[in-house]
Amino acid sequence: MFSTHHVSRLLIPLLFFFLFCCFSSTFAQDDITNPVEVRALRVIKESLNDPVHRLRNWKHGDPCNSNWTGVVCFNSTLDDGYLHVSELQLFSMNLSGNLSPELGRLSRLTILSFMWNKITGSIPKEIGNIKSLELLLLNGNLLNGNLPEELGFLPNLDRIQIDENRISGPLPKSFANLNKTKHFHMNNNSISGQIPPELGSLPSIVHILLDNNNLSGYLPPELSNMPRLLILQLDNNHFDGTTIPQSYGNMSKLLKMSLRNCSLQGPVPDLSSIPNLGYLDLSQNQLNGSIPAGKLSDSITTIDLSNNSLTGTIPTNFSGLPRLQKLSLANNALSGSIPSRIWQERELNSTESIIVDLRNNGFSNISGRSDLRPNVTVWLQGNPLCSDGNLLRLCGPITEEDINQGSTNSNTTICSDCPPPYEFSPEPLRRCFCAAPLLVGYRLKSPGFSDFVPYRSEFEQYITSGLSLNLYQLRLDSFQWQKGPRLRMYLKFFPVFGSNANNSFIFNRSEVRRIRGMFTGWNIRDEDLFGPYELMNFTLLDVYRDVFPSASPSGLSNGAVAGIVLGSVAAAVTLTAIIALIIMRKRMRGYSAVARRKRSSKASLKIEGVKSFTYAELALATDNFNSSTQIGQGGYGKVYKGTLGSGTVVAIKRAQEGSLQGEKEFLTEIELLSRLHHRNLVSLLGFCDEEGEQMLVYEYMENGTLRDNISVKLKEPLDFAMRLRIALGSAKGILYLHTEANPPIFHRDIKASNILLDSRFTAKVADFGLSRLAPVPDMEGISPQHVSTVVKGTPGYLDPEYFLTHQLTDKSDVYSLGVVLLELFTGMQPITHGKNIVREINIAYESGSILSTVDKRMSSVPDECLEKFATLALRCCREETDARPSMAEVVRELEIIWELMPESHVAKTADLSETMTHPSSSSNSSIMKHHYTSMDVSGSDLVSGVAPSVAPR
């Protein structure tokens, strides 16, 4: 046995040996970063708030030698003998604070990226000192103030992206000096004043995106002098009374012209001389006169001239356009015949479709055949020809299933599940090959089409060839149209089997860095059809945690570390077991201290009204999240049925990769949900935020979803009184979200599968949260009465006005609930075999046969109640938002119908809720009626049984 004295005698010389190695390696360390840039980086960090500690390794060591997060350096020293920072990539790190003027001291910088953070304040003029800068990427922040004149003196700038901020003031005339700039993205700000005519002299510009600003004055004819301009996008500005210059018809390279809602007047210019024009949107202006007769390019996919004051007839040149996807001439004063050749002569394959929107004009007839193929949609509502009963199918309201708004891969397989975070690779030669993908959020900022499906295969080839990957390494998980229109995508890239000698299931480090660098450096070539893209996020799963290693706490450079390793080889030979044991015991004590601190931190987290569960508690409740306990899956993640130690049965929502939030955002959402209490909302019982997991614990609903209870043939199907009770409860829950939650919440995804039923068949609305808050005015100047965002709805339930306005309101929830009411009335699904429930029931109502659509499984009910119920449902589903009732009116009318129900039906409903579930206390029918009605919906009944913890707004 070694005594303490013997151990000390061994440790002392060993300590001196290690110190010698450290000092020796320090003198032999690598080249260091320019001291001016080191000081600048430290000041830059001090000006930022870093709540998730992404920049924690900026405290130690040398930026270039110690792998500082987001810092990329040149590979060798420059003429001053120092290393220099070449890129500062701090995108999507949840940073806030201000941009420091010290950025101007990074004199050799080529890429400056703070995209998708929460940076406030103004843009430092000192950035204009970085003459080497090629990419200035500040989009997706909260920056304000004017654009500095100094930015116009960056001679090497290729791309300037300051979109989606709060920038105001004019465009500096100095921008006319940006002779190398190709991409000019300033959209979604509050930039005002005249577009400088001097910009027309820029020789390299290919994309001008200035939409959603406050620009005014006139449209400079000089813009037509740009020799390489491909995209001109100026939507939603205020060029009061100005006309579109005829010279814009001479933009020979132009692919897309979008001047929607710009207060433009005068005639539509003749654009027939633009050989490759693919997208034209001049809608929502005050253009007048007739549509030019010149034939547009065969490349055209979209023509939108709706909401103007155009007169005359549809020109014959709109027929025979081989790539046309959308023609919208709605809300004009056009007349005459509609040439059916527009859609009859369009050759369509199985992936292609065409939409022709001619609503609200003066068309009197259709020339040619009026029959439609399955992938052709024609809207004629509001024209004189709709008086012809044979055209009723073309004159109904718009429904969203006619428009391609998104897609998700099914990814079905006969293989057993991959262990998280691995997924089945799409590699064709290796079935059931599990691999860890790279997750990329990607957005096309100005696509040249209206329907993505026909171009999906072409896009997949474009992106994989640009990244030098095989086509099968990409899975386009889903895509969604956003306001703009812009196209958001969720991409997954998989490694090739056997490509990584150490681990076939993941990309090697160099490949991850290469792919990431291609995206962050905008090194994927532009494709005319897809337009400019932007990187929304690049997510690395935990298995890739070593790809971008953090600096060691010691702050030693790579050379120093190498010296220590080499010098320590000899020491390792003499290291005894007792010393190893001592070191291990010290480490164990250190780990225990860290674990205690973590437990203490979590234990101190208290949110009133909900419990903070440990990961172990929820794993135990679900048999370690056994697949046998899974009861559902949604956009947030998988849902498990669990039994807590107390015996309480709960539903546990476990966030999947892509749904995880920052800790602050997650806890903010928990705090909001904990304050929502109503008997018709699913109650949040607790949460878990540890072990890299985020989970929500809800009360368990024994009778599942309303969708299940309508579609499944129960021994005793739900009768009308029970369905009416469910409808009333659902409406009250939604009304609470609209009027009593603080801030108010628009649900945005009301559907039968989001209405759950407890043991007594009480309806409880589920799946609401922070992502659905009624908004305050944002950077686009949108009013606080609606949400403008990625559509969250479900086909069949989504407000049709969304496809015109890209806005969701409280009336959008009314529309969705109306669809649910129609489901309750008919037993049908929203969309079945291409038939839309709203359209079908409207047709039946107009023909006087509404009662023929009643679900035959229900017992007889007074016709008066059924007709009032159906009429209310159809009012909720009116195409025009203003024509729909408010949610408060819906509740009142449902209560009136409930009062009209015979006592025998109400009593039977009470009995049904008893016999179909666990025994509970009885109540007579009069009590049942009183319990579910209250003519003053703003009073006690709305919040009866509700803890008054949310103050009215």
Curated annotation (Swiss-Prot):
Q: Name one GO cellular component term.
A: plasma membrane
Listed A to Z, the keywords are:
ATP-binding, Glycoprotein, Kinase, Leucine-rich repeat, Membrane, Nucleotide-binding, Receptor, Repeat, Serine/threonine-protein kinase, Signal, Transferase, Transmembrane, Transmembrane helix
Supply the name of the protein.
Probable LRR receptor-like serine/threonine-protein kinase At1g06840
Q: Quick one: signal sequence residues?
A: 1-28
Q: Where is the Protein kinase domain?
A: 625-897
Check the record and name the InterPro entries matching this protein: Kinase-like_dom_sf, Leu-rich_rpt, LRR_dom_sf, LRR_N_plant-typ, Prot_kinase_dom, Protein_kinase_ATP_BS, Ser-Thr/Tyr_kinase_cat_dom, Ser/Thr_kinase_AS
Which species is the source of this protein?
Answer: Arabidopsis thaliana (Mouse-ear cress)
| Reactions catalysed | L-seryl-[protein] + ATP = O-phospho-L-seryl-[protein] + ADP + H(+); L-threonyl-[protein] + ATP = O-phospho-L-threonyl-[protein] + ADP + H(+)
